[in-house]
């Protein structure tokens, strides 16, 4: 590990370690006087980096290091809140580096991973209403809005036949929650099965309105909006609440945030009327969220990726052709 805390070129970088023994490089950055940000690997979408981050996060929690207040995992980084009067930055860096080095090879990792099933009304009345407002007040010629929705555009951009095939792709894969952020409890999810890894450009400009519970996609990332807010993801539907600071439903009794990093999410299709009823049941406490404990065996997952490589490449070619002939917002 190279100590850069006295360097003049970039005082934010305190130390770094090169890639070695199959492990990615690590960069340790100062994030103020109470936080250390550790970034791993290159700036690319690689879920194995997230698996390593979640493994490190669990190791740090289990170690109960005196002075560590909280750990916050992200896609390929981890933010550590610490008390520098108890734990100097250099000592914290050594702890993190040692625990990261002690992790097993990524193919031997097992990540605690709950399975959560959520209902979704695709092309629903609430997101359509906000899309209509966008056309009226923000951008009348937005190419990502076709027939009053974003799904037709998403299907076109990914080289799919129509909206129904796009919806089938969304429901065909589990979605890996790599991290929570941006708003309280907002999950950043990526498709476990790359054969269904749809990608979509963001709104341009962004929307002033997005309904709470809206499901959106930008790039390869799917997110659920925990609160009504502005947004730039293409809206494909709406689901039940995933954040409840009032903790009205038993699913939120221990934590007002439903989803945690490492969860796997699948969607079932419902209509608007069904969703209204389900949301009412969530709020009165009678709805039972479908949550099952589980574990992701990373080795088995990597073997599965290898077995579907040709199918994945075929979809990416089809996807690329769709993107080439589709305008970007």
Where are these regions (language model features)?
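Glycine-rich active-site loops that engage anionic ligands at enzyme catalytic sites
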Residues: 2-329
């Amino acid at each position: 590990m190279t100590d850069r805390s006295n360097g003049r070129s970039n005082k934010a970088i305190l130390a770094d370690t090169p890639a070695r023994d199959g492990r990615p490089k690590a960069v340790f950055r100062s994030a103020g006087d109470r936080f250390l940000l550790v970034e791993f690997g290159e700036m690319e979408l690689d879920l194995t980096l997230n698996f390593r981050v979640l493994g490190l996060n669990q190791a740090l929690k289990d170690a109960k290091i005196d002075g560590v207040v909280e750990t916050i995992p992200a896609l390929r980084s981890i933010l550590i809140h610490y008390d520098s009067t108890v734990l100097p930055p250099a000592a914290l860096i050594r702890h993190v580096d040692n625990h990261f080095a002690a992790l097993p090879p990524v193919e031997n990792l097992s990540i605690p991973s709950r399975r959560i099933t959520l209902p979704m009304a695709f092309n629903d009345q609430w997101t359509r209403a906000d899309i209509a407002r966008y056309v009226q007040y923000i951008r009348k010629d937005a190419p990502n809005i076709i027939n009053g929705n974003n799904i037709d555009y998403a299907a076109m951009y990914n080289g799919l036949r129509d909206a129904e095939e796009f919806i089938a792709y969304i429901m065909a894969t589990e979605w890996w929650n790599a991290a929570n952020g941006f708003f309280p409890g907002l999950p950043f999810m990526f498709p476990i099965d790359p054969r269904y890894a749809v990608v979509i450009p963001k709104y341009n400009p962004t929307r002033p309105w997005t309904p709470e519970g809206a499901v959106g996609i930008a790039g390869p990332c799917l997110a659920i909006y925990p609160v009504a807010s502005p947004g730039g993801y293409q809206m494909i539907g709406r689901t039940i609440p995933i954040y409840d600071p009032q903790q009205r439903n038993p699913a939120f009794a221990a934590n007002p945030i439903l989803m945690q990093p490492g969860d796997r999410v699948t969607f079932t299709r419902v209509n608007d009327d069904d969703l209204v009823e389900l949301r009412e049941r969530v709020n009165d406490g009678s709805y039972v969220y479908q949550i099952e404990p589980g574990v992701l065996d990373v080795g088995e997952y990597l073997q599965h990726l290898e077995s579907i490589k040709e199918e994945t490449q075929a979809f990416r070619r089809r996807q690329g052709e769709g993107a080439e002939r589709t305008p970007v917002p």
